[in-house]
Design a protein with these regions (language model features):
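Polytopic membrane enzymes that build or remodel cell-surface glycoconjugates and lipids
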Residues: 1-257
Length: 257
């Protein structure tokens, strides 16, 4: 039995080192941002989003979930964001620690997911690591992780990374019908932050490079190759359009207001 375990460990280390790279990215990112778990709320929307938010302050409840999906709060319709705060309070109690902890964990997970998505797309192990590490450890990421209000960034980022991974899998031969999962993950991400409206455009860019699904978009017969790639994303474009309109309405800027 021990021999089998040794062989398995040796295979993972020698044959699939990317597992260890993803784990290392997670661990180092967690260590770098761990001090944020000791921070307090700050007077930049934290109190407005959590202690003073009646949807969130009581913890998780089905009534709160219903309210999250039916209420525009402070010009935002972000039900997944409010539900995530409810879950924090339910698991860790009142106070900022749980919110900070979940932010840090989400960011560390996102670092590993980004590496894995890049590696699956390119096969370039160390370049994928470098890009993921730059994303995870850049000082500009501190605001999104250490500021509880910016949960929307790391939470939508998690759905974004998962959507990328599922899409890469869907693009591999033999053809896999996983676009429904991409749609679902994009929907959840948009309910945390509306910036995910760019996802279908990004997927088209990935079709060109590095996935190489459509070939040269300017070459002979290119539309015949690209038409099905655009068509499969029509539901995603429609979803983006819906959330763009919804965001304009909730911010009071639609219809000339």
């Amino acid at each position: 039995m021990s021999g089998m375990n040794e062989k398995s460990i040796r295979f993972l280390w020698v044959g699939r080192p990317e597992y260890w790279i993803a784990l290392a990215l997670f661990a180092v990112t967690l260590a770098l941002f761990w001090p944020a778990t000791g921070y307090d709320y700050i007077n930049l929307d934290d109190h407005l989003y959590i202690p003073e938010n009646p949807m969130v302050s009581g913890g998780f409840s089905w009534g709160g979930v219903h309210q999250a999906f039916t209420t525009v709060y402070e010009q935002w319709w972000l039900p997944m964001l409010w539900i995530s705060y409810m879950a924090d309070i339910e698991m860790f109690g009142e106070g900022p620690f749980g919110h900070h902890l979940v932010n840090v964990l989400l960011h560390a997970v996102n670092a590993g997911l980004l590496f894995w998505a890049l590696f699956r797309m390119t096969g370039a192990r160390w370049r994928s690591f470098f890009v993921a590490a730059l994303f995870a450890w850049h000082p500009l990421r501190v605001e999104s992780v250490a500021w509880i209000t910016e949960r929307k960034d790391v939470l939508s980022g998690a759905f974004f990374m998962l959507a990328l991974l599922v899409y890469v899998r869907a693009a591999e031969p033999p053809p896999a019908r996983r676009m429904g999962w991409v749609f679902a993950l994009m929907s959840l991400g948009l309910m945390a932050k509306s910036s995910l409206v760019v996802l279908p455009f990004l997927l088209l860019l990935l079709d060109y490079w590095p996935l190489g699904r459509g070939g040269d978009p300017w070459g002979s017969g290119s539309w015949g190759r690209w038409r099905p790639l655009v068509a499969e994303k029509i539901p995603l474009f429609a979803l983006s359009a819906i959330f763009i309109v919804l965001t304009l309405i909730t911010h009071g800027t639609a219809g000339g207001e």
